A protein has these predicted regions:
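Long, contiguous, compositionally biased segments that the model treats as domain-scale units
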Residues: 1-228, 232
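Serine/threonine-rich low-complexity intrinsically disordered regions
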Residues: 72, 96, 100, 107, ...
Length: 467
């Protein structure tokens, strides 16, 4: 990121009061910018109103006159800073203008708190889209020396665009690569660097978007990258752009987003799903994320190095939840559910006959039949077994490769019993079939790829390559 977003000071205006602020490690401290005690007290009174408990953006500028926006999610806390009264809040999102001079603002075609495109780049995005796809190496001879020259491919060779919809808003999703200049070396000012390549995913919109939409677009992209990298602790940079009168994008702001991750991991490209392999299905994947159908992945995927090396009972519970959801992605569940509906019809018929022969008993009101009847369905072990049978060839390869127990109804039952024991009694005992976690984790991914429309052969290639 080209600008400091972790610690700085400046002024912001909240309603009709001006405050000096200091940002340090996500915490914004506010001091009323007035000398008179009465004015300072009146300024702080603004935080007592009910409206201040609602999420909002506070706008101002830093000491170098860059415009600033802090996102406030909850109430502002009041206290003391030395002898002065102050207020504090934690911000999960900071937006800072990309320029601070009149020339910068003259190029904006909308108010500064609007954008036509949001770009996510670097970090784990470089894992799912290798930036070296944009270059090729040419070997040549220079006199007596053999040299290798780097040349950039044509833009069309490493750029792809598709249509997606997020929150009811249509956008163009573009995946490509850009070159960033390297920072100057203070120890050798005359040195020359080629800079660095970063892959990016950009969402661009026909109509300008408000800052309030940043969180939704970021969350969608974060889950997308997490799914493809198979880990939740992903990272990348974010900036905003406006479209100028020549239909070119002009960088308008940088974003700093605090996601709560304790550590970040960059991936071995052999363990990730390349976005290029499923690019045609990205609109379907984005739709599933936007609908909330894939939120379980936030719990299921590892969040740090420790999670990569161990399995907890919470992981087992989350995996069972994910498998329950995956069952409803499957085409077979409709066939199975039809069986359940026919069973319910038969039960209703039997109850009707029973009541006719026993008029003094009302099963619906005098027994727990209604509640049992409402939850009539296949057991989780049967649902998982259905999914396994649909993906048997792939999952057997993964189980054999990793030396785990064979997947069958018996071992699935033993695995589900771990979840049930913890959920219902708080007591569970690890057994050999806990090792079933990895092939069943793989099964969730196979089901997801099928769900978003990846063909069977490509699913097999992806699963056997990255798991």
């Amino acid at each position: 990121m080209a600008t400091n977003m972790d610690s700085f000071s400046g002024y912001i205006k909240i309603e009709n009061s001006v405050f000096a602020f200091t940002l340090r490690d996500q915490i914004v401290t506010l001091l009323p910018a007035y000398s008179e005690p009465d004015q300072r007290g009146k300024a702080l009174d603004v935080f007592s109103s009910e409206s201040m408990k609602e999420p909002a953006f506070f706008y101002g500028h830093d000491e170098s006159l860059h415009q600033i926006a802090f996102y406030k999610q909850s109430a502002v806390n009041q206290g003391k800073l030395g002898l002065s009264s102050s207020a504090k809040f934690s911000t999960p999102l900071i937006v800072k203008s990309a320029g601070n001079a009149s020339g910068f603002y003259s190029k904006l075609t909308e108010e500064w708190n609007k954008f036509h495109a949001i770009t996510f780049y670097g970090g784990n995005i470089n894992s799912i889209c290798d930036p070296e796809n944009a270059i090729f190496r040419v070997r040549d001879v220079d006199g007596d020396r053999r040299v290798t020259r780097l040349e950039k491919r044509d833009l069309s060779e490493y750029t792809k665009t598709t249509k997606v919809t997020i929150g009811g808003v249509s956008a163009d999703l573009t995946v490509s690569v850009f070159e960033s200049p390297a920072p100057k070396n203070p120890d050798n000012p005359q040195s020359y660097s080629l800079g660095e390549l970063n892959s990016f995913i950009r969402l661009s919109f026909t109509s300008a978007q408000d800052f309030s939409t940043i969180e939704r677009y970021y969350t969608t992209m974060r889950i997308l990258v997490a799914i493809l990298t198979k880990q939740d602790n992903v990272h990348f940079e974010v900036y905003l752009s406006q479209r100028d009168l020549k239909d070119m994008y002009y960088k308008s702001a940088y974003c700093k987003i605090y996601d709560g991750s304790e550590e970040y991991l960059d991936n071995n490209t052999n363990t990730i799903i390349s976005i290029a392999r499923i690019f045609d299905q990205i609109p379907n994947l984005i739709q599933a994320i936007d609908n909330g159908n894939l939120n379980i992945f936030r719990d299921l995927l590892p969040k740090n190095r420790r999670d990569l090396r161990s399995i907890s009972i919470s992981n087992v519970q989350d995996l069972c939840t994910a498998l329950e959801m995956a069952y409803y992605w499957s085409e077979r569940h409709e066939e199975k559910d039809e069986y359940i509906e026919n069973l319910k019809i038969s039960i209703k018929k039997a109850i009707k006959e029973f009541v006719a022969n026993n008029p003094g008993v009302d099963p619906n009101n005098e027994t727990t039949l209604s509640s049992c009847f409402g939850y009539l369905s296949f057991t989780l072990k049967q649902r998982i077994n259905t999914l396994y049978n649909e993906n048997k060839e792939i999952i057997d390869i993964i189980a054999s490769r990793n030396g785990t127990p064979n997947v069958c109804l018996e071992t699935i039952k033993s695995f589900v019993d771990l979840r049930n024991g913890k959920t219902h009694s708080g007591i569970f005992a690890w057994n050999e079939n806990a090792k079933l976690f990895y092939p069943l984790f793989t099964l969730v991914y196979a089901c997801l790829l099928n769900y978003i429309g990846v063909d069977d052969e490509t699913v097999k290639e992806i699963i056997t390559c990255v798991f």
